[in-house]
UniProtKB/Swiss-Prot annotation:
Zn(2+) 1 binds at C59, C62, C81, C84. Expressed in the soma and in the germline. Keywords: DNA-directed RNA polymerase, Metal-binding, Nucleus, RNA-mediated gene silencing, Transcription, Zinc, Zinc-finger. A zinc finger (TFIIS-type) spans 124-166. One of its GO terms (molecular function) is nucleic acid binding. This is DNA-directed RNA polymerase II subunit rpb-9. Residues 28-49 are annotated as: Disordered. Residues 34-44 have a biased composition (Polar residues). Belongs to the archaeal RpoM/eukaryotic RPA12/RPB9/RPC11 RNA polymerase family. Component of the RNA polymerase II (Pol II) complex consisting of 12 subunits. It comes from Caenorhabditis elegans. InterPro entries: DNA-dir_RNA_pol-M_15_CS (IPR019761), Rpa12/Rpb9/Rpc10/TFS (IPR012164), Zn_ribbon_RPB9 (IPR001529), Zn_ribbon_RPB9_C (IPR034012), Znf_TFIIS (IPR001222).
């Protein structure tokens, strides 16, 4: 029972933080006229730790959950209790982190015509190891491990090949 309640609370909080990051001014604005809110989507996973998890704050007076709100006069993020009117200024202005991590293969698949992208530089000094053509598009990116250095990635400019490699 406890795990079910915890999971449900995490889903609700995930939805809440996502809506707050989308520009809703307060918790009440997230609901429709009938008081219902859409359920979080199935592919949303509530964060338990790491950079995507911001945390839950509780009221020091009544132990209820504190909700993020904006103080419209001073334009400061506040946490406020709905039960006892306790308010405190947020130490961290971040209420939600959405970190996107993609592999290089995924990045080149997202932009299907990467070889025709006019914003990317082209080179004729690096020969494709698959087809032997000497024209390639290149870009710099970082792998999943943030501690690694940026690497230079090449994509063969041949329409038939489009092989991806790094040196």
């Amino acid at each position: 029972m406890y795990l079910q309640l915890k999971s449900k609370l995490e889903n609700v909080l995930s939805y809440f933080f996502r809506k707050m990051s989308q520009g809703y001014d307060n918790y009440d604005d997230m609901y429709d006229q009938n008081g219902a809110s859409p359920a979080p989507s199935q592919n949303e996973k509530p964060g338990k730790s790491g950079p995507g998890f911001v945390g839950i704050k509780f009221c020091p007076e009544c132990n209820n959950m504190l909700y993020p709100r904006e103080d419209k006069e001073s334009r400061v993020l506040m946490y406020s209790c709905r039960n006892c009117e306790h308010r405190e200024v947020a130490a961290n202005p971040c209420i939600y982190v959405n970190k996107l991590v993609h592999e290089i293969d995924e990045l080149t698949q997202i932009v299907g015509d990467i070889i025709h992208d006019p914003t990317l530089p082209k080179t004729e000094e690096h020969q494709c190891p698959v087809c032997g053509k000497s024209k390639a598009v290149f870009f710099q990116a970082q792998t999943k491990k943030a501690e690694e250095e940026m690497r230079l990635y090449y994509v063969c400019a041949s329409q038939d090949c489009q092989h991806r490699w790094t040196e």
